[in-house]
Swiss-Prot record:
Native source organism of the sequence: Candida glabrata (strain ATCC 2001 / BCRC 20586 / JCM 3761 / NBRC 0622 / NRRL Y-65 / CBS 138)
Function summary: Involved in nuclear export, actin cytoskeleton organization and vesicular transport.
Example of a GO cellular component annotation carried by this entry: nucleus
Subcellular compartments: Cytoplasm; Nucleus
Record keywords: Cytoplasm, Nucleus, Protein transport, Transport
This protein's name: Protein BCP1
Cross-referenced PANTHER family: BRCA2 AND CDKN1A INTERACTING PROTEIN, BRCA2 AND CDKN1A-INTERACTING PROTEIN
Similarity-based family: Belongs to the BCP1 family.
GO BP term, example: protein transport
Biased composition (Acidic residues): 20-43
Major location (coarse): cytoplasm
Length: 276
């Protein structure tokens, strides 16, 4: 059953998607204002209101949009190492939350999915993760050997202009759904794949000679920023986190975090966003 929630409800629970309420106006306004003029207070400001609804992942509607967002998350090179269609199917068969603005039949602007590692450890994506880095391989192998700890493979991506206010309810909803699917128990650990970017990356220079690329790497080594601001907080409390090599300005990011630390990170992120 497709469900939705208003952003104003802060995402603690999903509400039933009653057809008679599909056109109901959301109570939250995510607004942007033009305040460039010094005397903007004396002028009429333009306000753009956007209503965001949270839905369960829908294989019949969301497949192609989720596949596109996965490709955006992994980047052009890593995407070629993963079976994207199979991964999209896996995501949409797992506890997944999407965010839309034009009703349940529209394309999602954002998704967050918790893939049960134990149930899908033989999937193409799990095999891909084990080959990425010995730290991930060792962690997953430990889970396989002990057998008494659960783990979610977390995938999340969104359009670049999505407001950060959606992140906290997005995670809380999906954690609640994942626990409900596991007899009320949350996952013990989460393996999060994300991405960063080189702030000063120059595509023209990247296409030049090798020495130019090498010099650029040295100059821009510390000039790295986050696509997902919440990753700063995840890394702060992570058991393990590391970055991959820069590929045309894109840097893969990997985080292993336990449940309590994930909850703490989300709470801290919510508090930080409230001050922006």
């Amino acid at each position: 059953m497709v469900q939705a929630i208003k952003l104003s409800e802060l995402g603690n629970r999903k509400r039933r998607n009653d057809p008679v309420n599909e056109d109901e106006e959301s109570e939250i306004d995510i607004s942007s204002t033009d305040s460039e003029e010094e005397n903007a207070g004396d002028e009429e400001q333009e306000i753009v209101n956007i209503d965001f609804d949270f839905f369960d992942g829908n294989p019949d509607v969301d497949f192609h949009a989720v596949k596109h967002l996965i490709r955006q998350l992994l980047g052009p090179q890593e995407s070629n190492r993963v079976q994207l269609s199979a991964l999209s199917d896996l995501i949409l068969s797992s506890p997944t939350t999407t965010i839309k603005t034009d009703g349940k039949e529209s394309d999602p602007y954002c998704f967050l999915s918790f893939i049960n590692y134990k149930e899908n450890k033989d999937s193409d994506y799990a095999k891909y993760l084990r080959k990425l880095d010995t730290r991930i391989e060792t962690f997953l192998q430990t889970l396989d050997n002990t057998g008494n700890k659960s783990c979610a493979l977390v995938m999340s991506e969104r359009l670049i202009n999505m407001p950060p206010e959606v992140v906290t309810p997005l995670y809380r909803i999906t954690m609640e759904d994942a626990a409900a699917a596991n007899e009320g128990k949350p996952f013990d650990f989460y393996v999060i794949v994300s991405r960063k970017y080189e702030v000063n990356f120059d595509m023209d220079e990247a296409e030049g000679d090798a020495s130019a690329r090498s010099k650029k790497r040295v100059r821009g080594k510390s000039e790295v920023d986050y696509f997902h601001e919440e990753d700063r907080f995840f890394e702060k409390h992570a058991k393990v986190h590391f970055d991959g090599e820069s590929k045309k300005g894109l840097i893969a990011s990997y985080i292993i975090i336990d449940h309590d630390s994930l909850v703490k990170s989300i709470n801290e992120f919510e508090q930080e966003v409230s001050t922006w």
